[in-house]
Amino acid sequence: MTVETGIVVGASVSHSHASIDQIETAADGSQQTAVEELLSKEGVSEAFVLQTCNRAEAYVVANDSETGTAALAGYLAGVDDDAIRMLSHNQSLKHLMAVACGLESLVIGEDQILGQVRDAYEDARGVGGVGPTLNDAVLKALHVGERARTETAINEGAVSLGSAAVRFAAERHGVTGSTALVVGAGEMATLAAKALDDPASRVIVANRTRERAERLAEELSTTASVVGVDSVDEAADAADVVVSATGSEDYVIDTADLGGVGETCVLDIAQPRDVAPGADGIDGVAVYDLDTIESVTDEARAKRREAAETVETMIDEEFEHLMTQYKRKRADQVIAAMYEGAERIKARELRTAVSKFEAEREDGLSEREHEIVESMADALVGQLLSAPTQSLRDAAEEDDWATINAALQLFGPGLEPEPTELPTVPDGPEGVPEELRERMSSGMLEQFSTNDD
């Protein structure tokens, strides 16, 4: 019997190194379905999956990294290799913390990801994916994510063009209670839609690929609907605010689409531009382009970059705390087994001693005498195991699993000798192992010299 160290292996398919198509392939199906699939793979004992419009990540726990890597490779078989970032044990734990802090987000420090990690945790727990290893890892990530947002300025100010455009519109025209049209479903359009999610009463998403628009709409908590790009004119007529951020080479919104829409704020954050020249001259229509909006983001970006350095240091500290927590728990498994075995031996020997007293004395042991004998046995167990307990904790701190597993073989359940298997008593002090002899008093050693007397 050996103590299992629970290796975490992770895989990330995100906006930093994968296309939207690859992310969607990796995120096929629900988070719970993905966790169940991973748990069905050989050697996987725990699993956690996080899916958003900009990332699909999976983490598994196995007895070795090879088993975990094979399980994740099978799970992501349809995704291009260059779109997958594989993560070792330490990398997985740190990466998950960075994700929860918003350091891996399109917009550094954005708040939504923390709630998404929490939801993914509940999803994984719901299907039995979260065991002791991932439970500690995810809860630590959530903890450091909350610390980052309360102790630093990581989430202050608008730093993306999408969120900056919405803030710009809010300051000049107001967006609270408005109907907003978002044209596009890529990076900037997604950020704009999420920035509008709280203040707007309704969001319309228009995109050439309807599936992507629907995926974005599903992530919004406000009332959301989806239309095709060919229906932009009708959607614009119903909107108070229009944000356009497609990757089209041609104009997506022309002057005819905005004719007669009334008071409308149009934010064109696409490159090249989505809105045809001349739209700004239409009565009631105010058009703002990239040059106007980009200036809003510079100061906020600088503040978040500075905060990110503080958060990275915070992650390093919390990672060390997590590793210490893991090591202590694993050592405690062995210590518990050691005490469990000692308690069984103590109980057996107490029964033997009490039986002898009862055989030799008509009235046996009194209740007080029984308490004294049992107290002495407890004290012996505690004193004898005190030094090994500390040694095991020291071994865990030093990752000395050979010593820990050797102790488990010696003291673990099912390995105690039968009562008839008596140990060999050394003939003299020289027969006592040197390491043990150094810990024994001279009086104890002298007892071995008188064993034959």
Swiss-Prot record:
NADP(+) binds at residues 184-189. The active site is at residue 53. The record marks 95 as: Important for activity. Its EC number is 1.2.1.70. InterPro entries: 4pyrrol_synth_GluRdtase, 4pyrrol_synth_GluRdtase_dimer, 4pyrrol_synth_GluRdtase_N, GluRdtase_CS, GluRdtase_dimer_dom_sf, GluRdtase_N_sf, NAD(P)-bd_dom_sf, Shikm_DH/Glu-tRNA_Rdtase. The keyword Oxidoreductase applies. Pathway: Porphyrin-containing compound metabolism; protoporphyrin-IX biosynthesis; 5-aminolevulinate from L-glutamyl-tRNA(Glu): step 1/2. One of its GO terms (molecular function) is NADP binding. It catalyses: (S)-4-amino-5-oxopentanoate + tRNA(Glu) + NADP(+) = L-glutamyl-tRNA(Glu) + NADPH + H(+). It holds the Pfam family GlutR_N. HAMAP family: Glu_tRNA_reductase. Possesses an unusual extended V-shaped dimeric structure with each monomer consisting of three distinct domains arranged along a curved 'spinal' alpha-helix. The N-terminal catalytic domain specifically recognizes the glutamate moiety of the substrate. The second domain is the NADPH-binding domain, and the third C-terminal domain is responsible for dimerization. NCBIfam families: hemA (TIGR01035). Catalyzes the NADPH-dependent reduction of glutamyl-tRNA(Glu) to glutamate 1-semialdehyde (GSA). Belongs to the glutamyl-tRNA reductase family. Homodimer. This is Glutamyl-tRNA reductase.
